[in-house]
Amino acid sequence: MNRREFLKCCSLLGASVALGRTSADAKWLTNEKANGFPQGMLVIDAHAHPDIFPCTDFFCDKTSTLEDIMNIGMNASCFAVVEDENPAGGFQRLIGHLLDVIALEAEGKIKIMRRRSDLPHSSHPPGFTPGAILAVEGATPLETDPNRIDELYDLGVRLITPMHKKINLIGDIMTAVPSNGGLTAVGQQMVERMVSLGIIVDIAHAHINTLQGVAEIARINDVPIIDSHTSLTHRENPYGTTRLRAFEEMEMIAETGGVVCTWPMGWYVDDSHHRTSFLDWAKENLEIAREIGIEHVGLGTDGGGGLPALIDDYESILDLPKLVEAMDEVGFKRSEIAAYMGGNLFRVMKQCIG
């Protein structure tokens, strides 16, 4: 039995034991709440755009806002900026978006997490300031210049999602016919620079052939990678048409020590294939945990990013305590829920950013 098989067996055993609990074992849910979350539970959202995109006549997503992050007592959230639609002048516009987030720190509203010691472990002291993981989604504006990664790092960026909605010089995406054949030579140089600086590499949106190349670099350098916002596909052949991951892909991430983060996106195919409730979300988390280990599953809402559909009764991150309750209902132990809600991502952060 290898390490992966051993961890999987441990996960199955833990889940089976948890499923046998009585309602009395779940009293911690009602007796220790603070702002909706159990007291002391570390909560980190691996992917969100809080107040990043202004509302227009065509788009308005307030599912993650700084106000709600503070009200619910979330320890930290990703603040991901995007500028990959128009390459011309994209890097300078990207810098401008990052400076807008950095201005929030100057106003005392957030604490940008440049090192693990910046994470606020307690979310309710007087004058609480939530942590912010400064992130870039879509590395197209970086073009082929690794020095631009250094510039982002100096600003405080600690997470980069190389791929987004368009195929770029780094690799292929999940939602278009691949044309690069995987991670390119330039892409390899860019990812290696991210890793060397201490930037978390997020392979959300990356096609499986690009994921394979990034995962290989991660294994060689002994660092974890993440997919910050996805869920389990129901398709037998998912590749090229969906943002959802198959177990094969999740396993690649887990083998680096990384985390697959699930989101509140809702969908319905038929009565046997649907994801429409908090209970469905929790059951999916259990299924993934049984396959790759609970230590490799986490939370990433994509709040503010305009998900096309949400599960029922999810309006914003203020509803996340309902997921905690649903995960308890399907059999997760308190320690496992805590790992999912933020502990696993914090482990990745400690290993990557120092």
Regions found by a protein language model. Give the residues of each.
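Loop-centered beta-sheet repeat module
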Residues: 180-215
